[in-house]
Amino acid sequence: MSLKHYPRIQLAQEIAKALRGESSISDAPNGLFLAAPRRTGKSTFLQRDLKPELERLGVVVVYVDLWADKKRDPALLIAQAIGQVLGEHLGHVAKLANKAGLKEIKVAGVLTVDTSKIGQVDGLTLAQALAKLQEASGKPVALIIDEAQHALTSQDGEDAMTALKSARDQMNVSGINLMIVMSGSDRDKLMRLVNNNKAPFFGSNITTFKELGPDFIAHVAQLIEAEYKSFAPLDRAALMAAFKAFGHRPQFFIAAIGQSLSPLTAPEGVRFEDALLQAGKDKVASEEEQMASDYIGLPPAEQVVLWRLLEQGQKFRPYDAAALAFYEEKLGKKLTPAQAQNALDGLRGRNPSMVWKSLRGEYAVDDAAMHHWYGVAINDGAWPPRGALVSDVVAKKRPRK
């Protein structure tokens, strides 16, 4: 039984059609921006479904994950990904040129290729490199950038986004020669690529990536029933409920299936579907307990600044008058702008980082799942977490019943 990959062929075909301008109601030719929580199958889909489908249609695809190496500048990762694919195509042209005894050849009557420098993109802008790739291959190009919001953390990264927008405008004058797909695991961060007139792709829309649903559950159920016939028929609705409990995250769901089927770890006297549902609830509870533990372990200043960030979201301003008043109320003492900045720096410096910062000084929680955790705690009247240093101050200010 293999649950490693569930192909989403129809979705890949629909997106490819939209990117190629074959859908009259889609703005995808101007750029497709997909947002989905971590671990919900977005990256797998881009690499194993969308990329092959575009290639099947005769499109040259460049894929780059900006989280592949967070220590390297995002712009460098993008340039190297383009350069690698460009080198592959120019290498083919070079072989043809060498066989003909030529030092230089022209591709499509326009592009001059120096065969002694094949694969090198030094001195080329991103727009020029993409144009050369399209001309050398004779095919349209699709650039897929995973975790694209990370580009906004450096000047070169932000400049690269602006350059890609320019490349799109230049290359698509006479048809769709450059398709751009950008994805992110945090909608709020990805939104910063499009949400104001200073954003590189201002005016574009963020699309929520479709979660795996009943079709995926039916696929999983059929595989299990084929190998474990005593389990048939499985309750699809119960399996779907369990998958939802895992936050629609296939990796954790499938791992729990393996544990529930193993004679070494399967719970006794519990229906398979119920065991999965409980495993999903336990997984989320464990993650939330870890978030609470991490929060409780912070110094008071970092606790209160993170609280403000969770409460305000994109409206967060670290040291405006309202923020400083908030800090004083929750801490029981004043926090200066410099102290608030030190708290933010401390949150960013933790491993893993708890706060993300863009080049323009915009802040967000690093793990978007914290927003859900915070919202649930607020609704349950369980905020701040018991044991947090700021909770003592808040408790003292609450009126006694």
Predicted regions and their residues:
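Conserved nucleotide-binding/hydrolysis micro-motifs of P-loop NTPases
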Residues: 68-71, 150, 185-190, 212-214, ...
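Pre-Walker A adenine-sensing motif
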Residues: 9-26
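Conserved catalytic network of the ASCE P-loop NTPase/AAA+ motor domain
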Residues: 24-26, 133-137, 169-176, 199-202
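Alpha-helical sensor/transducer elements of the RecA-like P-loop NTPase core
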Residues: 44, 179-226
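Sensor-1/coupling segment of RecA-like P-loop NTPase cores
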Residues: 150-196, 209
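Amphipathic alpha-helical "lid/sensor" segments that cap RecA-like P-loop NTPase cores
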Residues: 219-290, 300-301
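P-loop NTPase nucleotide-binding core
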Residues: 28-152, 157, 178, 335-337
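C-terminal leucine-rich, beta-strand-based interaction scaffolds used for sensing/assembly
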Residues: 285-401
